[in-house]
């Protein structure tokens, strides 16, 4: 499988390719995507690929591909990637089924915001409590290098390029903290016809002595707080 995806505001375009590198055709190839309330999804693909019938599907000849295109728009905050099942039959009649997750996470729909230190801290304090905060401590892997300036550069890259947050410098006197701000875009409308968006803040605090990071997120919606924290934790584990 191969995936290409791009996002702008509350919308995304995801292209998925199912290639057959075996020595025989694959039959009854299907991609079944779970319906979710928080995403509006338009699906197109190779004829038969999106069949609901277990006996349907398409045939992928040797060294060819089936293709699936998803056009998505966010309707509400979410904290879990949509599920997809890929099913196919190999020669001899053996049926294979693989549960997967689509690479569609909340941080794909973020728009970076840069705040001055005073503005950041004011918003940070205003988002205390009411299930707006998520926090978790993560240890670096046993084979990870010590947390130093080079390591922190990778953390900055995670926050700015991975999470798509604007870095807010000057919020701390210590070099071991990275703060950022962003806006989660949705296609939903309020009563005045304006798009509903969610302001999001994040702080990643390093503890070089104990080889650990504390990730804290505060947003206007609990699911956004959880989603940003989860993506940050996974990214830091892979840093």
Predicted regions and their residues:
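A structural signal for beta-rich interaction modules in eukaryotic proteins
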Residues: 1-239
